[in-house]
């Protein structure tokens, strides 16, 4: 399975050199990683959290081209299927990819995420 560093490298390449996108995903990942560690998440949940943080804005380049903006609604609509394709060759399980896709597809709609915990055990 790809490491977080390898997924980060892949996402940076996917960002087409957009410094804003790269800086933003790096900041979001740093915050998510730190919060997850401080909360004591298990290794799999921490991994999913970090991958979701790295890929949460994966649809931005496509949205800029297709819609002329990166509106959150468009990011959610385009992001979930795009992240599935992006993660297909990482060695992640289907369940892990499903969870990341769910988070990416709802990251501008937190009310829709609140009904579902980050992990099934309540962590």
What is the predicted function of each stretch?
Residues 92-123:
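Histidine/acidic-rich helix-loop-helix segments that form or flank divalent-metal centers
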Residues 46-71, 79, 101-110:
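His-Asp-centered metal-binding catalytic motifs of divalent-metal-dependent phosphohydrolases/nucleases
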Residues 4-8, 29, 76-84, 101:
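An amphipathic alpha-helix signature
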Residues 13-17, 34-38, 60, 64, ...:
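General structural signal for alpha-helix termini and helix-helix connectors
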Residues 66-74, 87-92:
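Short coil/turn segments at secondary-structure boundaries
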Residues 18-49, 83-90:
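Alpha-helical phosphate/pyrophosphate-handling elements in metalloenzyme active cores
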Residues 3-27, 58-69:
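Active-site flanking loop/helix segments enriched in acidic
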Residues 24, 45-50, 75, 96-100, ...:
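Short, conserved alpha-helical segments within structured domains
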